[in-house]
């Protein structure tokens, strides 16, 4: 559960880091006030009286991974349509009202959740609660609103995926690695399925999943918990709860009719594109997350990620960029907050004159050494110090607490998990880290390798080229 900092902040010295870590390990993270309304809406309030500002977020426990065959993209589509108005607030008026009152708003969709947020002067909290509660139950959709917006999301996919070689590589790597998981399809959706979404699909999704008993209201800022509770009961309290289906994830990723996944055991993807001038290497491993059964491993992998691929002192950066100089950049990213196992990402950019195969060999060498010898006790101690400091830094914005809490609660964690995170990180041992690392990167590792190359020039291994050429994907998904 990486704490969201809002903005990356540099810590000036080791002395500051040590003092922050000491405080973080002995204190709670956000100290929220938590209650549940009679209709099942969870409410979380975090006080921050530094400025007369407030952030409201409403998180729904549904995302792209909950979509069914033939309807990929519907979660993100409805997110767009939530701004189309209600009987009392016209299309597009929601954001205009927020802006006229000096605030800003937006929304986002990922695999396990959909979230909506506003940041505004604290004395306007009642206004944004009224607006958000209104669209939780009164969204009004017509064909005239829905189908032009479908064109918008299709164009968004073209801009973000089709026109981005790096995004297409990432999409195809997820696909070949996570074929048996809904995380293997793009959160934005497969293009052919997006183009077939209807008004009825959007309304059905809204009526199925958008309910107070499937939502979390988070308020962070210059507020008093009792005042927030009174407003929540006034505006959200009257919304009736309704049964929400269990989040049953398919065991086999569903693709559009006639499409087939890449044959096993090949899990390599090479993408060539005329727009690419700088080759890129990527590797995705399947890793556990903060679910109840794998929380201990996730904590240990967070510590490992600090050692392995975070920053210029990491094992990966030092080996590839500083020592062998085969790369100009190298790092990793661990997606630990999710309902199901997901990718642990490694990336590197070859240095001028260096072949991408040298980069891959360098990455493999670093991983092999770690699997063989493990990390050191000092590396673990230093990594925990850096991580624990985030517990204090995460309080320095309104969006940080709201995002960290919402992401955690929509993916099966509890308030206690969030508040005890510093202590849990402090309890991670060298053995824990090495065991978790070997579980992901050892002999039974599941991974996909990706090469992003210019249209001409650098040659890829034949098995990678063959794998890429045999990939059959939905039209527009990978190419």
What are these regions (language model features)?
Residues 1-6:
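N-terminal secretory signal peptides that target proteins for export/translocation
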Residues 11-22:
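Bacterial N-terminal signal peptides
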Residues 25-64, 88-123, 160-214, 238-291, ...:
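Non-catalytic beta-strand/loop surface segments
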Residues 63-71:
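Short pre-active-site segment immediately N-terminal to the catalytic Zn-binding motif
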Residues 69, 126-129, 163, 230, ...:
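Solvent-exposed, non-transmembrane alpha-helical starts
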Residues 72-86:
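Active-site SXXK
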Residues 133-141, 235-243, 364-375:
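A common structural junction motif
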Residues 150, 203-235, 445-446:
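Non-catalytic, conformational "gating/processing" segments within enzyme and secreted inhibitor domains
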């Amino acid at each position: 559960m990486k704490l969201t900092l809002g903005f990356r902040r540099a810590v000036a010295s080791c002395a500051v880091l040590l003092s922050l870590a000491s405080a973080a390990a002995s204190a709670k993270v956000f100290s929220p006030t938590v209650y549940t309304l009679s209709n099942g809406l969870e409410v979380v309030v975090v006080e921050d009286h530094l400025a007369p500002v407030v952030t409201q977020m409403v998180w729904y426990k549904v995302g792209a991974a909950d979509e069914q065959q033939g309807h990929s993209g519907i979660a993100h589509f409805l997110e767009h349509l939530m701004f189309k108005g209600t009987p009392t607030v016209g299309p597009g008026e929601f954001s205009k009202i927020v802006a006229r009152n000096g605030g800003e708003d937006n929304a986002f969709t990922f695999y396990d959740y959909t979230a909506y947020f506003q940041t505004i002067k604290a004395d306007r909290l009642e206004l944004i609660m009224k607006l958000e509660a209104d669209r939780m139950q009164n969204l009004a959709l017509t064909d005239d609103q829905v189908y032009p917006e479908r064109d918008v999301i299709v164009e968004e996919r073209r801009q973000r995926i089709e026109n981005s070689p790096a995004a297409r590589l990432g999409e195809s790597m997820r696909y070949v690695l996570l074929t048996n998981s809904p995380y293997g399809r793009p959160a934005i959706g497969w293009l052919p399925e997006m183009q077939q979404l209807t008004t009825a699909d959007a309304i059905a999704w809204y009526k199925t999943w958008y309910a107070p008993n499937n939502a979390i209201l988070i308020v962070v800022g210059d507020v008093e918990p009792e005042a927030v509770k009174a407003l929540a009961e006034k505006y959200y309290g009257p919304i009736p709860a309704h049964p929400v289906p269990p989040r049953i994830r398919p065991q086999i990723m569903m693709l559009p009719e006639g499409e087939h996944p890449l044959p096993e055991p090949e899990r390599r993807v090479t993408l060539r594109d005329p727009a690419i001038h700088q080759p890129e290497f990527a590797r995705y491993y399947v890793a556990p997350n903060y679910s109840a059964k794998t929380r201990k491993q996730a904590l240990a992998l967070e510590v490992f990620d600090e050692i392995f691929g975070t920053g210029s002192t990491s094992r990966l950066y030092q080996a590839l960029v500083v020592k062998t100089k085969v790369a100009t950049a190298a790092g990793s990213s661990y997606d630990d907050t999710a309902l199901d196992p997901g990718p642990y990402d490694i990336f590197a950019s070859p240095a001028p004159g260096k072949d991408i195969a040298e980069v891959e060999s360098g990455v493999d060498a670093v991983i092999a050494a770690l699997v063989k010898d493990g990390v050191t006790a000092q590396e673990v101690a230093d990594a925990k110090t850096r991580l624990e400091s985030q517990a204090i830094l995460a309080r320095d914005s309104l969006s940080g607490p709201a995002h960290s809490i919402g992401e955690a609660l929509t993916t099966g964690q509890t308030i206690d998990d969030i508040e005890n995170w510093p202590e849990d990180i402090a309890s991670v041992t060298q053995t824990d880290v090495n065991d978790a690392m070997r579980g992901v990167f050892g002999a039974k590792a599941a991974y996909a390798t990706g090469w992003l190359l210019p249209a001409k020039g650098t040659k890829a291994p034949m098995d990678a080229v063959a794998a890429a050429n045999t990939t059959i994907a939905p039209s527009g998904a990978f190419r």
